[in-house]
C-alpha cells in the first residue's frame, strides 16, 4: 500500500522548476530520494511538509489529499531536517517537554528510551551538542509521537559514518512492522546500499529513475548517462 504518493507535483521558481514529480512510498519500506545538491530534493520535501507552497499537483497521504488532513492525521507524519529545528538554548529534556505539549500521542517512555539508546544527555543545551548529537535529538523527537511516516531531508548526510550507521539501524527497526515507512533524501549513495528498499533519482527538478535497490547495479550506467555530474559516494 502507498502511504505517500505525489501526482504531477510542481513548484515553479524564476530560476528553477520542480515538475511532474510522481513518487510513491510504500508501507514497510525505506525510500531514498537521491540527487546532487540543487537537484530538487529539499524543494520536494518542502512541498510535502507545507513549508513550500506547491505550484500544482497533488500530495496524498494514505490515499487522502494532504490539503484536507486533520491535525490528528498530520501528526502521523514526522519531519527531520539537516539543522535542528528547536531554539539552541533548549536542553534535550525541554525538546521532549515541547513534544508532550504539541502531540496528544506523545510517548514519553519511547522518548526516554531513545535518549538512552542514542546516548543523548538530557540536561545539555542543544548549542553544546555536536552536529551528530543534534541530529539524533531531532530524530528521537520525530519518532516519539508514533508517526506512520518519517521524512528526512539530508538529516544524516553530514554526519560521520559511525553516527550514520547508528541511525540507519534505528530506521530499519522503525519500518519492521510493515505499517510504517521512511522517505529520506541524500546525496550519499553508500546510505542507499545499507537501508533503501527503493531509490528515486532526481536531476534538475525531474525524476529520472525509480528502481528497487536490487536493480541498482544494473541500472547505474543509465543514471550516469542522464546526469551531468556524479553523486558523492563514500
Feature-to-residue mapping (PLM):
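Conserved structural motif at the start of ABC-family nucleotide-binding domains
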Residues: 4, 18-20, 74
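The feature captures the beta-strand-to-loop junction immediately N-terminal to the Walker
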Residues: 34-36
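Helix-to-loop junction immediately C-terminal to a conserved catalytic motif
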Residues: 49
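Conserved ABC transporter NBD signature motif
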Residues: 57-68, 73
Amino acid at each position: 500500500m502507498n502511504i505517500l504518493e505525489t501526482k504531477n507535483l510542481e513548484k515553479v521558481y524564476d530560476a528553477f522548476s520542480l515538475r511532474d514529480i510522481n513518487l510513491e512510498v510504500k508501507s514497510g519500506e525505506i525510500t531514498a530520494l537521491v540527487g546532487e545538491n540543487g537537484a530538487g530534493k529539499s524543494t520536494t520535501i518542502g512541498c510535502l511538509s507545507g513549508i513550500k507552497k506547491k505550484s500544482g499537483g497533488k500530495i496524498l497521504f494514505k490515499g487522502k489529499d494532504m490539503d484536507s488532513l486533520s491535525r490528528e492525521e498530520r501528526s502521523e507524519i514526522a519531519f527531520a531536517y539537516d539543522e535542528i529545528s528547536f531554539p539552541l538554548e533548549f536542553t534535550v529534556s525541554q525538546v521532549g517537554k515541547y513534544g508532550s505539549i504539541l502531540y496528544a500521542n506523545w510517548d514519553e517512555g519511547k522518548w526516554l528510551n531513545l535518549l538512552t539508546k542514542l546516548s543523548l544527555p538530557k540536561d545539555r543545551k542543544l548549542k553544546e551538542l555536536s552536529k551528530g548529537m543534534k541530529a539524533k535529538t531531532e530524530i528521537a523527537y520525530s519518532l516519539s509521537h508514533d508517526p506512520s511516516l518519517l521524512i528526512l531531508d539530508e538529516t544524516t548526510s553530514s554526519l560521520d559514518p559511525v553516527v550514520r550507521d547508528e541511525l540507519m539501524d534505528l530506521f530499519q527497526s522503525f519500518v519492521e512492522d510493515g505499517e510504517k515507512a521512511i522517505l529520506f533524501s541524500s546525496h550519499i549513495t553508500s546510505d542507499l546500499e545499507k537501508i533503501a528498499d527503493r531509490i528515486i533519482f532526481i536531476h534538475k527538478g525531474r525524476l529520472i529513475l525509480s528502481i528497487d535497490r536490487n536493480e541498482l547495479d544494473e541500472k547505474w550506467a543509465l543514471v550516469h548517462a542522464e546526469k551531468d555530474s556524479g553523486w558523492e559516494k563514500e
